């Protein structure tokens, strides 16, 4: 009986550890992420960041994106990270893609979090219906998620 209880407790601890290790999926290839969003009928969250130099971006990551609340909430959307680092190397393809998206939406500051509803048109092109944007919100994940949820409720 003790062996059975011990085995059960070990299995429970291992499964709890694996659950806590689940990470949020951040896409960096915009086209692939948009296809996933359309296929799964989900909205998209673009995160414009300077991951290695922007203090507010790092603070947003720490206080919101690295929390269990955000991990749970993030299943509602497809996450895309558009990074503009100063010391981390990126491929030219990623740099060009990120700059194109930044110019397309007129993003001028970091962090910027932009929500869109992607729509595949009859000609195969994808229209990105802008729902709204935010950035760092003081008050932690609860306050930030309240702002994000209010933006996601908007429809075009």
Where are these regions (language model features)?
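Thiol-based oxidoreductase modules, predominantly thioredoxin-like and allied folds used
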Residues: 24-27, 49, 70-96
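The canonical Cys-X-X-Cys-His
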Residues: 45, 54-58, 113
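Solvent-exposed loop/turn segments at secondary-structure junctions
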Residues: 51-54, 84-89, 108, 120-122
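Typically the conserved alpha-helix immediately C-terminal to a functionally engaged Cys/Sec
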Residues: 56-73
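Non-catalytic, surface beta->alpha helical segment in thiol-disulfide oxidoreductase systems
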Residues: 63, 100-156
């Amino acid at each position: 009986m003790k062996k059975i209880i011990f085995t059960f407790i070990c299995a429970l601890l291992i499964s709890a550890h694996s659950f806590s290790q689940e990470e949020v999926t951040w896409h960096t290839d915009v086209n692939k992420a948009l296809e996933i969003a359309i296929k799964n009928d989900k909205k998209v969250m673009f995160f414009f960041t300077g991951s290695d130099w922007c203090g507010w971006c790092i603070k947003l990551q720490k206080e919101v994106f690295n929390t269990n609340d955000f991990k749970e909430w993030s299943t509602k959307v497809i996450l895309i990270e558009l990074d503009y680092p100063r010391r981390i190397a990126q491929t030219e393809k990623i740099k060009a893609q990120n700059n194109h998206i930044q110019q397309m939406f007129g993003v001028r500051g970091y962090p910027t979090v932009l929500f869109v509803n992607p729509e595949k048109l009859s000609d195969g092109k994808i229209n990105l219906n802008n729902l709204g944007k935010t950035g760092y919100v003081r008050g932690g994940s609860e306050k930030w998620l309240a702002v994000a949820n209010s933006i996601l409720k908007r429809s075009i």
